[in-house]
Amino acid sequence: PKTELQKQIVKLSGKLPALTEKQRRWGIMNAMDHVGLRLKKGLITCTHCGKIFYDLMKLEDGEMDICPNCGTHLKIETTTRKSCRDNEYFNIITTCHGFQVFRYFYIRKEFHSGKEASYCIREVVQNWMSADGKFKTMALLANMHSYYRDAWCLGTDLEIRANDKEAYHIGCDACYPVRRYLSAWKKYGFKGKVHSIYALDFFRLISTDSTAETLLKAGQYELLRMFCAGKGYEIKRTWPTIKICMRNNYVVKDTSMWFDYLDLLGDEGKDLRNAHYVCPDNLNSAHDFYMERKRRKEEKERRQRDMKQMEALKKYEKEYEKLKSRFFDLNISDGNIIIVPLKSLDEFRQEGQIMHHCVFTNNYFRKKDSLILSARIGEKHIETIE
């Protein structure tokens, strides 16, 4: 530690309570995915307690069962394996002398058939955040490159590390349910929930970015999740429209559909600051309505392009007939499959559309030394032959 703040954090870190047995047990049971190793004859080995029991329910792989010995929920896997290893994380959110502290614990599990699983749990990262959103990181030394998340040097100590190293940013879903928060967060609109956002990112953004703070206070949790997920550019781009929604107490619940809907409105030239358009009573219906309008418009434009293209290519129609008309009566059949030549540009276009290839768009009718035929069974086109 070099600065007074760093020295203070190091001192306070040493005063944090050790992991309790209750917290340890919670992490093992809730952060880890426990597997039931099932043999083909139906015997299941619990990879937590090591006991063996019979599969009475004939479960599919991936379905859950409960070990009758220890009560652990097991994901069933049919295999001949007799051992397994796994790594996972859980975190504890607490406070210490005016800091919001995020403590991350690394769990390493090793299991061998006939024995109980062994677990190694080590605290690997601490993020110390002040009420202004600035934070310092204490962590163990991480091996290899910055993007290796599980290569910890478990023999090292927690020390002040660089905030920007990817290994120290742990996206952890398992969060111990007993949490303590700074009262300072209330002024940013925090009411006890982080709304499925990683807590470190959540508090950092609401305290340093007025956009995130406004979204939280307005109850726009889906937009806030999108903002915290690195899509702030979309929020900034449509901020005037979002403000109209907030002014009219309209909550965006499906961000993907709503932003797609805004793009459709933009294509129609609609006013994106008009609540009548941007705050629909039924987003699904409004989205489908404008999607259908766009589809019809594109279909009309496509037909116009095709007509213009056909007009431009009409000059090749007579040339094609002159060169290939001698083959137009050709009919090859085995009684089931019929093979006939394409006789006009319209037939080339239809063949390309039906078979989804480029026989028309790449002007195969202009090839002087080739004949294009269509193989069919009844009305069904099955192959195009050159």
Model feature map: region roles:
Residues 50-54, 71-74:
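Cys/His-rich microdomains that often coordinate metals
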Residues 30-43, 55-62:
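Short, flexible, mixed-charge glycine/proline-rich loop motifs
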Residues 204-386:
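Catalytic-core elements of nucleic-acid end-processing and repair enzymes
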